[in-house]
Structures are given as structure tokens and as C-alpha cells.
Amino acid sequence: MYPEELVIPMKEELTENGFKDLTTPEQVVEALGQKGTTLLVINSVCGCSAGAARPGVLYSLTGDKKPDHLVTAFAGFDTEAVAEARKHMAPFPPSSPSIALFKDGELVHMIERHHIEGHPAGAIAANLQAAYEEIC
């Protein structure tokens, strides 16, 4: 498990921008069971999370269409919450960072780590904005 002093600033990059921090399996079940659209970010300490995933997600939310609910859990820190979230992200294998869009509790769009690594934040944002246009 990562030390809290390392993780908190990375969590705050999302939570200070409207994301609810999910730290328990129960919170994950409740969040993903909501009506409407829910964006789930599995946050991480890795460089591709800092350089592409988090900035890309935040930039994606500047458009007209966006998800109804924004939630996040941190891999290697919120271990039980992330394990529960990954159950809802099947059949995709565990991946962090990763970004999932749910509609009425069903997974409808997924960005895995291999889609994030080596791609700029703008590409992540464009991918998500296209999904929002279609789904939200």
C-alpha cells in the first residue's frame, strides 16, 4: 500500500474537481448503481496517470456533455474499493490507471492502461468526449 502523503495530492487532483472519493466496496456498489451516467477513474501513482489520465479526464469535462456522476478510487491504496470496482469492469482485466463509463449501472465504455500509456491527455479527453456525446 502506498503512503498516504504520496497518494493524497494525487487523489485531490480529482476530488477537488468534483469527483467523489470511493474508499469502501459499499461506496462503489452504491455509486455504480446510480441512475444516469457515472464516470469511474481508477487512479494510480504511475506517470501515465499523472501525465495523461488525470489531465485527460479533467479536460474531457469541459465540454457540454458530461456524466451525471464522477467517482474515483485509488489503486494500491483503496484496495477493497478498487477490487469491488474491478468486478463491475469485467470482462476487462485489472488495469491502473483506467477509466470506465457506466450508464444505469452497466459498463458502456472503457479505457485501459494500454490505451493511456504513450498517449497525450488531449487524446484521452477526445476519446471520453466522443463517448459522452454518444452516451450522456
Protein language model features and the residues they cover:
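Local sequence-structure signature of Cys/Sec-based thiol-disulfide redox active-site neighborhoods
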Residues: E30-D64
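Non-catalytic, surface beta->alpha helical segment in thiol-disulfide oxidoreductase systems
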Residues: P93-C136
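Short helix-loop-beta junction
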Residues: L6, M10-E13, L58-P67
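N-terminal leader/targeting and pre-domain segments
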Residues: M1-G36, C136
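Thiol-based oxidoreductase modules, predominantly thioredoxin-like and allied folds used
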Residues: K65-E84
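Conserved strand-to-helix beginnings and helix N-cap segments that scaffold or border functional pockets
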Residues: G51-P55, V82-A83, A121-G122
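Short acidic (Asp/Glu) patches
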Residues: V82-S96
